[in-house]
Amino acid sequence: MANITAQMVKELREKTGAGMMDCKKALVETEGDMEKAIDYLREKGIAKAAKKSDRVASEGMTHVISNEKHAVVLEVNAETDFVAKNDNFQQLVDALAKQILAVRPDSLEDALKTEMPNGQSVQDYITEAITKIGENISLRRFEVKEKADNSAFGEYIHMNGRIGVLTLLEGTTDTTVAKDVAMHIAAINPKYISRDDVSSEEVAHEKEVLTQQALNEGKPANIVEKMVEGRLKKYLSEISLEDQPFVKNPDITVGEYVKQSGGKVVSFVRFEVGEGIEKKEDNFVEEVMSQVKK
């Protein structure tokens, strides 16, 4: 039998929103396999589909800037929210964004080696900022996009940089539409542009989970297939940007809204500070230990 720790229960609870004891049971039944435990809870109707990268933990900020041809979205991390709101830190983030936009490096490693306008490497520039600010700071990730003439960038920053979104639309130069789409993405967090982008493996996995879920609900086998078909269609529309009801006008989809301007979404990047990075453990572990040991 796998050793089920308090941290594992905590992680599963955060990913699924299920109760503590349900999470413990799911982990026991699946011998500690996190992904199988998520499926177990979903099949039992206890949890909804979990996003793989919904564990937001570290501090920092995202930033988005652009020029006529290129745009960059990046994330810079710090240790505390206090520093993330500091003017010096925000100036650092802006300087790094401008550097990456100007140089357009291929990788994070290349970016850290590039030379800032003052002659320092980006790495040395960050190291100097660490000394001044007094916290560990790191350039975590970035993406650079290029656009053609008949295209538009959409930039949106939410909650003072907690979430940063960059969209690229082709077939239109309407930056208002592009920004509206970026705002929608910040709020709804779609996984794909179109349902056609969803892999056959993911579709097959979801169909398997939904089938087991319907059978566990006691539905007759002869209607399970039709139920699964409807639920799968709903799932695909929920994770696909073009099919989602537009946040500013739910009567139309995002795809329909963009089409009104003659455009089409060709790419988007959504960074949320700390996605997938775990913080130090807090008192929650103590809270669940007594439950796990029962």
From Swiss-Prot:
Query: Residue ranges of region Involved in Mg(2+) ion dislocation from EF-Tu?
Result: 80-83
Subcellular location(s): the record lists:
Cytoplasm
Endoplasmic reticulum as a keyword? no
Where is it mostly found?
cytoplasm
Q: Provide a Gene Ontology MF annotation, just one.
A: translation elongation factor activity
Looking at the keywords, is Cytoplasm present?
yes
PROSITE patterns assigned to the protein according to its UniProt record, in alphabetical order: EF_TS_1, EF_TS_2
- UniProt xrefs under CDD domains: UBA_EF-Ts
Q: Name one Pfam family in it.
A: EF_TS
Which Gene Ontology CC terms are recorded? cytoplasm
Q: Which UniProt keywords apply?
A: Cytoplasm, Elongation factor, Protein biosynthesis
InterPro entries the UniProt entry points to: EF-Ts_dimer_sf, Transl_elong_EFTs/EF1B, Transl_elong_EFTs/EF1B_dimer, Transl_elong_Ts_CS, UBA-like_sf
Its domain of life?
Bacteria
**So what does this one do?**
Associates with the EF-Tu.GDP complex and induces the exchange of GDP to GTP. It remains bound to the aminoacyl-tRNA.EF-Tu.GTP complex up to the GTP hydrolysis stage on the ribosome.
- Family membership noted in the UniProt record: Belongs to the EF-Ts family.
Q: What is this protein called?
A: Elongation factor Ts
Q: Which gene encodes it?
A: tsf
